[in-house]
């Protein structure tokens, strides 16, 4: 599982002209699932993200977690995170999980975050989406398990 995390001041995802999810301060997560991912990896990443201290404290040090600042998450599935561009000019997506497997693990990932008291908004799995954000920092991390 691969997650691109962006600390945001606000973010939204629109599907067919309708806002599917939006947040103020928090994380925009782009979530990719590969074919050999497990529930153990999903839970590890969700727990890691919930506890990451990447928000500034009074001394402007990254010392506060999403829960400390009462932030939210906008989680967007993105199979293209497993695009392989080693050969040719068009990405191959053979490392991305099949949609039924990916959706199940993506939903489990979001559920694990919610179990920790975090509000999680989402896009629509498998849909073409427009994602808008105001990056804060910018702070962008790539997490993989």
Swiss-Prot record:
One of its GO terms (cellular component) is cytoplasm. One of its GO terms (biological process) is D-amino acid catabolic process. Pfam families: Tyr_Deacylase. It comes from Exiguobacterium sibiricum (strain DSM 17290 / CCUG 55495 / CIP 109462 / JCM 13490 / 255-15). Homodimer. A Gly-cisPro motif from one monomer fits into the active site of the other monomer to allow specific chiral rejection of L-amino acids. Its EC number is 3.1.1.96. NCBIfam families: D-aminoacyl-tRNA deacylase. This is D-aminoacyl-tRNA deacylase. The keyword Transport does not apply. One of its GO terms (molecular function) is tRNA binding. Belongs to the DTD family. InterPro entries: Daa-tRNA_deacyls_DTD, DTD-like_sf. It catalyses: glycyl-tRNA(Ala) + H2O = tRNA(Ala) + glycine + H(+); a D-aminoacyl-tRNA + H2O = a tRNA + a D-alpha-amino acid + H(+). Gene3D superfamilies: D-tyrosyl-tRNA(Tyr) deacylase. It is found in: Cytoplasm. It comes from the Bacteria. An aminoacyl-tRNA editing enzyme that deacylates mischarged D-aminoacyl-tRNAs. Also deacylates mischarged glycyl-tRNA(Ala), protecting cells against glycine mischarging by AlaRS. Acts via tRNA-based rather than protein-based catalysis; rejects L-amino acids rather than detecting D-amino acids in the active site. By recycling D-aminoacyl-tRNA to D-amino acids and free tRNA molecules, this enzyme counteracts the toxicity associated with the formation of D-aminoacyl-tRNA entities in vivo and helps enforce protein L-homochirality. The keyword NADP does not apply.
